[in-house]
Amino acid sequence: MAATLTWILLFVGLLAGLRDTKAQQTTLYPLVGRVFVHPLEHATFLRLPEHIAVPPTVRLTYQAHLQGHPDLPRWLRYTQRSPYSPGFLYGTPTPEDRGRQVIEVTAYNRDSFDTTRQRLLLLIEDPEGPRLPYQAEFLVRSHDVEEVLPSTPANRFLTALGGLWELGELQLLNITSALDRGGRVPLPIEGRKEGVYIKVGSATPFSTCLKMVASPDSYARCAQGQPPLLSCYDSLAPHFRVDWCNVSLVDKSVPEPLDEVPTPGDGILEHDPFFCPPTEATGRDFLADALVTLLVPLLVALLLTLLLAYIMCCRREGQLKRDMATSDIQMVHHCTIHGNTEELRQMAARREVPRPLSTLPMFNVRTGERLPPRVDSAQVPLILDQH
């Protein structure tokens, strides 16, 4: 009975866990060419009642990716300063990204190790209203990217920029961290920020003040370490510290000329004084060159062979001339060596043989003669030179 109750409790807990882990779905409508910002608030993933605030000690981190892919799409970025602060998904979709995209977000509770999933259905559409051909980009060094992404500071920047760009309605086109543009990580000193690039667009032309700031003369002064040419009051200060030496203006009101398509020709070059075509080469007979290349090495090899044969065959002294030039004593000694060698070979062939003559005392090694047997061998000196 107790085992059955335990299994029932486990099954109920499993169903509750499956119900809690079911992903929520939110539909969003980003616009092509306009900045898109979606905050990932802790309250959304903790599912707390409305009257209960999120505890400040709760730590949540997020992981977002495109459905069916390990990472986010190329136009979308994610940032979160710390687990105590909310995360942000931001970016500017391009015309190639138009359509439907599903972003899966997983929240991790670092204290209780709970996970919560959320699906963001992005329906990317074209913006309504007039085009924004006049675009200006500013580098704000007094803020980090997550400090500008909320709507309040972004609207405050547009309102302050209206003092420099009086006419027309301003809209945010893109927000990029300076670190993504090759900026350096600031030192851990109070007041140092990473910096953020903010691109703003409008349907009205640039003001005279902005044109003067982005003029070549102003850039030349910045290169020399002097302040830029700012003829109007800086309405962005002191809330936004803009680097006026990094202001870029883009005018897309004039359509760019289309690249001329090259027309294919007939393949025949016209008369050109700088083009010298190669002359026609006359026919050549390579038989003589081939004979010289083959016959000369063969003749040289044949002459060397004949010379070597003459030296080896015709320049020998001969055995008779060699024997006549050799002394008799040396010849006898040579013959004795050969005779002794043959005698030793015969002795090795059979065991019981008489003593060799060369070992007998009556045998003269030099002359080869033998003493008479009647001579007493005891009186024969061992060394013949002694008598």
Curated annotation (Swiss-Prot):
GO terms for molecular function: calcium ion binding. Component of the sarcoglycan complex, a subcomplex of the dystrophin-glycoprotein complex which forms a link between the F-actin cytoskeleton and the extracellular matrix. Glycans are attached at N174, N246. InterPro entries: Cadg (IPR006644), Cadherin-like_sf (IPR015919), Ig-like_fold (IPR013783), Sarcoglycan_alpha/epsilon (IPR008908), Sarcoglycan_C (IPR048347), Sarcoglycan_N (IPR048346). Coiled coil: none annotated. The lineage of its organism: Eukaryota, Metazoa, Chordata, Craniata, Vertebrata. This is Alpha-sarcoglycan. Residues 312-387 are cytoplasmic. Residues 1-23 form the signal peptide. PANTHER family: ALPHA-/EPSILON-SARCOGLYCAN FAMILY MEMBER, ALPHA-SARCOGLYCAN. Keywords: Cell membrane, Cytoplasm, Cytoskeleton, Glycoprotein, Membrane, Phosphoprotein, Signal, Transmembrane, Transmembrane helix. Residues 24-290 are extracellular. Its main location: membrane. Strongly expressed in skeletal and heart muscle. Interacts with the syntrophin SNTA1. Cross-link to form 2 major subcomplexes: one consisting of SGCB, SGCD and SGCG and the other consisting of SGCB and SGCD. The association between SGCB and SGCG is particularly strong while SGCA is loosely associated with the other sarcoglycans. One of its GO terms (cellular component) is membrane raft. It is found in: Cell membrane, Sarcolemma; Cytoplasm, Cytoskeleton. The modification Phosphoserine is found at S377. Disulfide bonds: none annotated. It is a single-pass type I membrane protein.
